Amino acid sequence: MFNKEIYTQRREELRKRMSNGVIVLFGNNESPCNYPANGYYPFRQDSSFLYYFGLRRDGLVGVIDIDNATEMLIGDDIDIEDIVWYGSVDSVSDMAAQTGITATAPMKELKAICDKAHNTGRKVHFLPPYRYDTKIQIMDLLGIHPSQQKEAASVELIKAVISMRQCKTDIEIAEIEKACAIGYRMHTHAMQMTRPGLTEKYVGGQVNGMAHSLGEHESFATIFTQHGEIMHGNPSYNILESGRLALCDAGAENKENYCSDNTRTFPVNGKFTQKQLEIYSIVEACHDYALEVAKPGVLWYDVHMNVCRLMTEKLKELGLMKGDTEAAVQAGAHAMFLPHGLGHMMGLDVHDMEGLGQNYVGFDEEIQPSTQFGTNALRCGKRLQEGFVMTDEPGIYFIPDLIDDWRSQGLHKDFINYELVETYKDFGGIRLEDDILITKDGCRFLGDNIIPYHPKDVEAFMAENL
């Protein structure tokens, strides 16, 4: 938790960016994984609640009165029976003091606060809920059915929160760098131990263990697989085979809940084949191009599209694509190989603020999301600003089901050499991902050390440990 003045200043700035009414920011509750009171999923506080209050205990709600410039922390103290099982914890008033608030109230009083605002014609602002218990809580407090809450959420509050959270301060960048340091250890450990005969699940479990031992936990479900063509393939009992590529997409969350997110693809046996190098070098070139051009004022959408053009040109050199590059990209033919966006924002969420709505977080009045397959998965397209933290993550994938589907429909046959693509159906996929900070005149890697990604560096690093 940062110094309480940080949270006081953030809440004051939030009030200034709002017109009037009452802001209600819901913290998260514990969530049982199989039955109540035993066996909970790991607790994770809501990120916007964390940003403005910094408190990691479950069952809390923050109330900010815009008009009267007052603040209150709502929550119930635990009783002696809970203390027996879980130990002593800070009281609600103690936690309020830690975040610079003096007024507290039990949860039963929250409805009266909301009713008073409503009865005096003042708007109750809340963010879009994403957990069922918060949706039920909002229904009980405001009478809004869960199916209508996304539309009823305060757009004014959404935009105000995004405007504050999207540009990271120096103290936030320092925390992200700490998460990146853990991420470096996770990925280099995966490279060090990967070899034929191990299972994906074994290596993935070791990667997760590194996150838990050095930080809070992993920032999302770790992807470790030799089937890199599956975008979000969880580790399974597949046995790693010599000649295949292992894809590791993993990140850490540090004790302040800031995230890292990296992807590396490397040969199971430590040596790339020529065929693998040809595809890998294209992804590497796309990754490095984005690093060269990312800077304040540049549309991230344009960077993404130029990466698609570069990838198409190089796939044409291998004979996998053909025809006019611009026509192929405009038609979306490249998306058979790259069906996702170039990158996303990152911070307290690995996909930062995604619950607030893609149209507000990654896009704006200037540019809105595409509806075209592949490009519609781009999570951010707006102009970069100094202080943005982005991921740079191009990839090339050979997805058998997608290849068969498009070929059966005759899609983009003027741009895709299906006969040659057929010979790559057992190739898998390659993705390279790094976390970058948009600086005053460009961008830089986050973290003190860069996880090896140039082919010779990858092979040399793995050779030291095989």
Predicted regions and their residues:
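Active-site neighborhoods and metal-handling regions in enzymes and metal-associated proteins
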Residues: 1-466
